[in-house]
């Protein structure tokens, strides 16, 4: 029995598509990294995800303020739509939640 050095990977579960057109839109490296991370996080049926700025920051290696700036740029280009969410705490108070990101088709 021959063993592989690399474990078998499920092509649907372990990979996500990054459209080729993303490289012809004039995005900088940070915007591409953020867009790719949001695609990684998205639900493929609803095209939505809700990672925090801190989580995105840890994943791509940029500060949360820089993430915010580049997300606004991606919104202006029509690649993303963001919606605020609300969270109700145990004591009944409402607080701001993470943004809900909807990935728009290219």
Please provide the spans of the model-predicted regions.
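Short recognition helix of helix-turn-helix/winged-helix DNA-binding domains
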Residues: 1-66, 72, 94
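Winged-helix/helix-turn-helix nucleic-acid-interaction surface
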Residues: 65-106
């Amino acid at each position: 029995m021959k063993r592989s050095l690399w474990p078998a990977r499920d092509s649907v579960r372990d990979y996500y598509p990054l459209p080729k057109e993303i490289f012809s839109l004039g995005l900088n490296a940070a915007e591409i990294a953020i867009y790719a991370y949001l695609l990684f996080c998205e639900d493929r049926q609803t095209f939505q995800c809700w990672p925090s700025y801190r989580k995105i920051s840890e994943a791509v290696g940029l500060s949360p303020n820089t993430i915010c700036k580049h997300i606004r740029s991606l919104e202006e280009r029509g690649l993303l739509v963001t919606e605020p969410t609300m969270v109700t705490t145990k004591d009944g108070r409402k607080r701001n939640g993470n943004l809900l990101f909807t990935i728009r088709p290219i």
